[in-house]
């Protein structure tokens, strides 16, 4: 698994995705394809339940622990949480990320909610392709 060179991208395609989170806390939401980098610009979670709070878990699995050219990580982890058991009040919205996060080919975004159907996750992204 190589890191795509973002200087030589052949296309940049933006988009949005929405998920109604299940109570399977390790559900796969997306996997980054080969020769792609996913730039996540924003992640929000809205609690659509009018009376009860719900917790959200969101993490990236499959991260490379080898680093990239010019970086030698020490103690890098292949699984990292962006949010872990974070409470989202009823009828409220939580911003999980509002600055860019890059996911590389093979990285997997996973997550879920403490109550099935209570949380909607929205993300805005760009796919950078060097194929």
Give the predicted meaning of each segment.
Residues 41, 52-56, 117-121:
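Short beta-strand/loop motifs in extracellular/secreted proteins, especially
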Residues 83-87, 98-100, 110:
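Beta-strand-rich interaction surfaces with strong enrichment in secreted/lumenal proteins
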Residues 25-28, 81-82, 95-97:
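Short structured motifs
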Residues 91-106:
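Beta-sandwich interaction modules
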Residues 47, 62-64, 125-129:
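Beta-strand elements of well-folded, non-transmembrane domains
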Residues 38-47, 108-111:
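A short beta-strand element within beta-rich, extracytoplasmic domains
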Residues 1-37, 105, 112-131:
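C-terminal interaction-tip segments
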Residues 50-84:
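Short, surface-exposed beta-strand/strand-loop-strand elements in extracellular ectodomains
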């Amino acid at each position: 698994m190589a890191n795509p060179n973002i200087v030589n991208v052949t296309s940049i395609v933006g988009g949005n995705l929405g998920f109604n989170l299940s109570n399977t806390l390790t559900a796969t939401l997306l996997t980054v394809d080969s020769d792609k980098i996913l730039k996540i610009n924003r992640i929000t979670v809205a609690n659509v339940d009018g009376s009860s709070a719900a917790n959200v878990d969101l993490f990236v699995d499959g991260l490379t622990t080898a680093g990239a050219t010019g970086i030698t990580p020490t103690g890098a982890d292949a699984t990292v949480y962006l949010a872990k058991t974070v409470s989202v009040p009823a009828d409220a919205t939580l911003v999980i990320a509002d600055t860019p996060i890059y996911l590389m080919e093979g990285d997997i975004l996973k997550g879920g909610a403490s109550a099935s159907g209570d949380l909607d996750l929205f993300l805005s992204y760009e796919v950078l392709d060097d194929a």
